[in-house]
């Protein structure tokens, strides 16, 4: 099969497009033909080995050079070999630790979920990492609550706006002026231009501030957070992947944030990924959530997809299709 192999840390051009042996499923796994995948910040942090903690997460053996392997955590495809829960021909999607940037991948059955019935493989591939993160970030949000999504036009943000609206919350958004119409179309009310408006001095108050962009300090954000509100840290600018954990540490240390709840939304650490994907499939099938796909790249152009994603200007998700005939929306 064809796969993009990582054999060194570096830019997208460091990935090598190779012929590698077809994987053989172990007990509890099924073989899946990958129809589409995507690129996430999680992927390009491991590609570059930046920040350095990403290298420690390879198991401690990749400080100077990563273990040879395949990146990619978002998967939408079709089952090839039978398991106990899935049969050949079943359309599935999953959030993997890695391995989706290949034609085939062996997946533990307990990570797989049936694809949303109304979505194509390309659309479904946009969901796992971003949509799971967004849904985890909004746990506990009830109808009538006020939610602010900072970074509303990216992968996580576009799902967060839709999900918060579907949960009955009032949603405001922070993004560029160029993406304001997109945010409104997804359900946002007030939209702040991050270049021109200081949303932290808007005078508004929110029950939840979901920070995807990571360009304002948690102490500035507390100005718009209710005293019993929740600050949810998701991401930060390139090279500052550990920033969300820093927010949680500062809150735990006490001070002005001590009365407020600060949490970290981490899809990778989620223990019931398949169940969450099943929940998201139901939201999608009801029409409450639709993936926003900015660009779709052919598989052999994966390096360009990495470069575009890393530039940080994508509206929604960057999807990579493997050119296999599959389900259309």
Predicted regions mapped to residue ranges:
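Glycine-rich phosphate-binding loop and adjacent beta-alpha segment
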Residues: 212, 216-288, 323-329
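Mid-domain Rossmann-like dinucleotide-binding core that forms the NAD(H)/NADP(H) cofactor-binding site
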Residues: 125-193
């Amino acid at each position: 099969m064809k796969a993009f192999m990582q054999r060194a840390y570096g830019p997208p051009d460091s990935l090598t497009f190779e012929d590698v042996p077809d994987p053989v499923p172990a007990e509890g796994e099924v073989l899946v033909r990958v129809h589409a995948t995507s690129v996430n910040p999680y992927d390009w942090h491991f590609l570059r080995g930046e920040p350095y903690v990403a290298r420690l997460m390879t198991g401690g053996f990749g400080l100077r050079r990563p273990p040879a392997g395949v990146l990619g955590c978002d998967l939408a495809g079709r089952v090839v070999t039978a398991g106990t829960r899935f049969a050949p021909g079943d359309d599935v999607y999953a959030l993997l630790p890695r391995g989706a940037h290949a034609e085939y991948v062996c997946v533990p059955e307990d990570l797989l979920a049936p694809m949303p019935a109304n979505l194509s493989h390309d659309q479904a591939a946009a969901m796992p990492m971003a949509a799971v993160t967004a849904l985890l970030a909004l746990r506990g949000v009830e109808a009538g609550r006020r939610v602010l999504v900072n970074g509303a036009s990216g992968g996580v943000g576009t799902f967060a706006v839709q999900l918060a609206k579907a949960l009955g919350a009032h949603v405001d958004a922070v993004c560029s002026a160029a993406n304001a119409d997109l945010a409104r179309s997804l359900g946002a009310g007030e939209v702040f231009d991050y270049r021109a408006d200081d949303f932290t001095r808007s005078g508004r108050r929110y029950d939840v501030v979901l920070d995807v962009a990571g360009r304002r300090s948690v102490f500035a954000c507390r100005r718009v957070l209710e005293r019993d509100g929740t600050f949810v840290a998701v991401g930060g600018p390139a090279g500052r992947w550990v920033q969300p954990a820093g927010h949680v540490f500062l809150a735990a240390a006490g001070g002005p944030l001590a009365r407020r709840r600060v949490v970290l939304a981490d899809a990778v650490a989620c223990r019931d990924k398949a169940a969450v994907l099943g929940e998201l499939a139901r939201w999608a099938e009801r029409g409450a959530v639709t993936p926003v796909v900015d660009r779709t790249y052919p598989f052999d152009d994966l390096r360009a997809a990495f470069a575009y994603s890393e530039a940080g200007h994508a509206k929604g998700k960057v999807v990579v299709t493997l050119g296999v005939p599959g389900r259309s929306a």
